[in-house]
């Protein structure tokens, strides 16, 4: 059983690499099997076909992303201070920008978002609805604690997250700007805190 699970994981890892490099349509089951070191017929013991691999890959990536970054349903602990908010937010963003598997899946999602309905929905969730919904809840929780000034949490969330999404996209396109993008994101977050959060001193 362990060997079967290990092979399934290897198949997903190989598929992610090939999908990110060549696109979904540019990748064959035979190519995936070759990287894993198995024959194509053996791959069908684990997955029904390429679409099944794609769905399993999205499912596993979404579960990992939710566990490490969070989601609208799992926002984590509400920060108790400005510094805690900056630290936790930058930790989440740094993870999603540095993790090789997350970067590969994001690259693949961006490439395939116009060709696959599910991928389009997942991309919109990560770049817009999901991330803004999550931070709207965090900001609302901080308003209730008296840390954030009273305002529309959804609008503040959009103002907070939109520049970060643009910087992440830039770093994905041009990896040489990764550190600069992280610095710009932190500067924006601190400016956001200066404008909308109450000085705790």
PLM feature segments, named:
Residues 1-6, 201:
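N-terminal intrinsically disordered/low-complexity leader segments
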Residues 10, 14, 18-60:
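Helix-turn-helix
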Residues 50, 57, 61, 65, ...:
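Hydrophobic/aromatic residues within well-ordered alpha-helical segments
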Residues 56, 70-103, 154-160, 186, ...:
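Hydrophobic alpha-helical connector segments
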Residues 61, 65-69, 117, 164-175, ...:
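Short amphipathic alpha-helical interaction/hinge segments
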Residues 90-98, 106-114, 192-196:
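Helix-loop "lid/cap" segments that line or gate small-molecule binding pockets
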Residues 98-100, 104, 110, 117-144, ...:
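Amphipathic alpha-helical packing segments from all-alpha helical-bundle domains
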Residues 121, 125, 139-191:
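Hydrophobic/aromatic-rich alpha-helical bundle segments in the mid-to-C-terminal region
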């Amino acid at each position: 059983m362990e060997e079967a699970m290990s092979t399934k994981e290897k198949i997903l890892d190989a598929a992610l690499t090939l999908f990110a490099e060549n696109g979904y349509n540019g990748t064959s089951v035979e190519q995936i099997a070759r990287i894993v070191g198995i024959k194509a017929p053996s791959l069908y013991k684990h997955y029904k076909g390429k679409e099944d691999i794609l769905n399993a890959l999205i499912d596993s990536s979404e579960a990992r992303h939710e566990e490490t970054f969070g989601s609208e349903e799992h926002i984590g602990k509400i920060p108790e201070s400005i510094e805690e908010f900056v630290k936790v937010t930058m930790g989440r963003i740094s993870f999603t920008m540095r993790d090789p598997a997350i970067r590969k899946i994001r690259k693949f999602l961006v490439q395939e978002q116009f060709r696959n309905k599910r991928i389009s929905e997942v991309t919109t969730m990560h770049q817009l609805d999901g991330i803004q919904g999550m931070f709207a809840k965090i900001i609302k929780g901080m308003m209730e604690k008296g840390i954030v000034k009273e305002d529309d949490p959804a609008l503040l969330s959009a103002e907070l997250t939109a520049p970060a999404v643009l910087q992440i996209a830039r770093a994905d396109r041009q990896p040489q700007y990764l550190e600069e993008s992280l610095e710009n994101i932190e500067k924006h977050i601190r400016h956001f805190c200066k404008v909308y959060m109450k000085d705790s001193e």
